[in-house]
Amino acid sequence: MFVIQLATLSGFKVITTSSPSNFDLLKSYGAKYVFDYKSPTVIEDVSRAANGRLKYIFDCHATDNSTQTAVKTLPGAGGVVATLLYVDESTLDRKVEVHVPLLYKISGKAFPFGPRQMPASPEDKAWSEEWCVKLSKLVVEGNIRGNPIKVMGGLEAVAEGLKFMQEGNVHAQKLVYEVLKE
């Protein structure tokens, strides 16, 4: 939902997918079109809404299958898919650029990531410092809002929350644990 808001504020027409129970919620965050990700016509639905002008996709589900679907949705000229996990790029259309934005990169230091060693990136550190100021302002001004939350209780409820999440029961919300009650 954060990405939907940033894209909308940046002037993009946001087309997204979700389960039908979250259509209205995602529209309230700025999505112009929302389609059922389980629909057998989801690729055609998104393509039709984009009117052949789809260039950028953010895949927050981040599985090989979801990234493949994203790539198939892009028109023949290609485009850019940002995904949260590495995928086997050898199976993807060469006209598509795949980006994996890693939060760790904002430290500006090298770090191991699975079998890869990610290089230091002073540029990412400088970018993140600039954007932290901008994002803070957007939040304070009410232009960015957080996801709906589900309060699970105290730290004793963490195991329950992890099970809840592993069973696929977390949809369009963040699980929150009360560490200190005032």
Residue ranges and their predicted role:
Residues 1-182:
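Terminal helix/beta-alpha structural elements that buttress the NAD(P)+-binding lobe
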